């Protein structure tokens, strides 16, 4: 659904194909775009349609419904920096060490798969998604600019955190005053309770390795 903010008569809706692709004609306006699909969490985005302009390849990313006792972390960004990486680490109540990033995309515990990174996107935009299967622990999530361009603060990034019992994700956008260079400390998750950090680390001790 495309809900126009400036002129309600411009509002409309479209049904995508099975692959999620769609084509639509829109009047110039600012739209609140709500995406719905069976088995997925409803998501809302803002999209500005400029007069006499065509758009191709615009993407609206939605997330599957959560399994019980799990969480999902989705990292999205723009064309620059090209290669951002997700880092999740911590400890479960049962004593398992959890560490997931592009070098170690899955982490097993004594009861099975603790967490998994779906893909390592190296050409901009993302999304990169980590699924966490055990909320009984304390975990930290950070984003690292693999190429250490020092432009993460300039171009920004967004993290969406999906938690059980929540109808919509918590959206965390990089604070423009955080002073981030190449590492962004995003949040801590303590037994399912989200604590937003949104800051630069005291020391940039998350150093990327080779890919």
Regions inferred by a protein language model and the residue ranges of each:
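Intrinsic-disorder/low-complexity signal
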Residues: 51-211
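A short, amphipathic beta-strand motif
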Residues: 1, 20, 71-75
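Short, flexible loop/turn segments at beta-strand junctions in immunoglobulin-like
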Residues: 23-26, 132-134
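Edge beta-strands of extracellular beta-sandwich domains
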Residues: 41-49
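A short, solvent-exposed beta-strand micro-motif common in secreted/extracellular proteins
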Residues: 28-39, 139-145
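Hydrophobic beta-strand segments
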Residues: 1-6, 33, 86, 157-159
């Amino acid at each position: 659904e495309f809900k126009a903010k400036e002129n309600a008569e411009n509002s409309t809706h479209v049904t995508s194909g099975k692959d999620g692709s769609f084509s639509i004609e829109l009047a110039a306006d600012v739209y609140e775009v709500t995406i719905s699909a069976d088995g997925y969490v409803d998501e809302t985005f803002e999209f500005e349609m400029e007069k006499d302009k065509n758009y191709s390849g615009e993407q609206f990313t939605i997330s599957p419904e959560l399994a019980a006792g799990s969480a999902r972390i989705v990292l999205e960004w723009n064309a620059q920096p090209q290669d951002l990486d997700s880092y999740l680490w911590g400890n479960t109540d049962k004593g398992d060490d959890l560490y997931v990033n592009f070098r170690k995309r899955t982490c097993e515990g004594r009861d099975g798969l603790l967490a998994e990174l779906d893909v390592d996107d190296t050409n901009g935009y993302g999304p990169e998604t980590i699924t966490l299967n055990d909320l009984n622990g304390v975990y930290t999530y950070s984003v690292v600019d693999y190429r250490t361009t020092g432009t993460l603060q300039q171009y920004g990034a967004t993290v969406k955190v999906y938690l059980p019992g929540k109808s919509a994700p918590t959206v965390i956008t990089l604070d423009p005053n955080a002073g981030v260079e190449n590492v962004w400390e995003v949040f801590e998750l303590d037994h399912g309770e989200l604590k937003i950090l949104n800051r630069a680390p005291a020391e940039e001790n998350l150093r990327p390795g080779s890919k």
